[in-house]
């Protein structure tokens, strides 16, 4: 078994109904990864349709012409922004930091596209596996409350709370409730 040396915690914020809402959220300027959920035009249920990263502010990336064309395929769009829990990783100015973000994006895109019931509008990274073992832990924050955490919303149920890729296999798990028993 390969050695797993990369494990990252991603703090997700959302859902945002518009790009302007993203700008209002304190801390969103540190976000580098984003999800778009919605329904493909006249097809299927609501779900995750796009995973991307951006060196720039996510709101600006979502306004780009090529991105707006992809988003036009979706109805009932909502946006989720994410950042590494280690703040120095969120700056994608160096090649090493950009590569780290690319590996996280690839892990999420490949995991989601391998599930037969998910139809993504991503056209990149759908065929290449992560280049080395990697793991992420997803943590969910409320839209406008810095300290507020909550359980993963049902629309994001396809993303596990913990996702690992080791030896060409995906391992996934969700949060478990555990109540410690103390005998009296």
Give the ranges of each region predicted by the language model.
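Boundary/linker segments flanking structured domains
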Residues: 1-49, 55-184
